[in-house]
Regions:
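Short flanking/linker segments adjacent to small metal-binding domains or redox-active Cys/His motifs
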Residues: 72-111
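Short Cys/His-centered divalent metal-binding micro-motifs
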Residues: 22-25, 47-70
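Short hydrophobic alpha-helical module
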Residues: 12-23, 36
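Short Cys/His-rich Zn2+-coordinating modules
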Residues: 1-5, 30-37
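Short linker/helix segments within small regulatory modules
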Residues: 34-47
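Short, charged surface segments at domain edges that flank catalytic/cofactor-binding sites
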Residues: 1-16, 41, 72, 84-87, ...
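Histidine-centered catalytic micro-motifs used for acid/base chemistry in nuclease
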Residues: 18, 29-33, 50
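A short linear boundary/processing microfeature
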Residues: 36, 68-75
Length: 111
């Protein structure tokens, strides 16, 4: 993975898991919203920074709950463009994650 892409994702996350909102530890993963098996690439819009547990270990994790994850934009179908697929943030806001590292807010969340 390109270090600049990984760094942009980490900067966007601002030290927090992008699914639960808690502070990140050193035990985190860069999750492909459009899975590699679905044609997903290493792009800023396609990657989110998450706790290892939120990624694939805990009962509430992305991979163990694909329907919830797809509804929240944490996982994206093969025909979808991650940069154009809404993503639900921990505060409830609904955003588009862009490849330049910016976030376009569609619906404001709780502050």
């Amino acid at each position: 993975m390109d270090k600049k892409v990984a760094q942009a994702v980490l900067e966007r996350a601002s030290g927090h898991c992008e699914t639960c909102g808690w502070s990140l530890t050193q035990d985190y993963a860069l999750h492909h919203r459009k899975l590699k098996s679905r044609g997903g690439k290493d792009t800023v819009a396609n990657l989110i920074c998450v706790h290892h547990d939120c990624h694939n270990l805990a009962t509430y994790s992305i991979h163990l709950n694909p329907e919830k994850s797809e509804a929240k934009g944490w996982m994206v179908n093969s025909w979808q463009d991650p940069a154009e697929t809404p993503f639900v943030r921990p505060d409830g806001s609904i955003v588009l994650l862009k490849d330049d590292g910016t976030i376009f807010e569609l619906v404001k969340g709780n502050e």
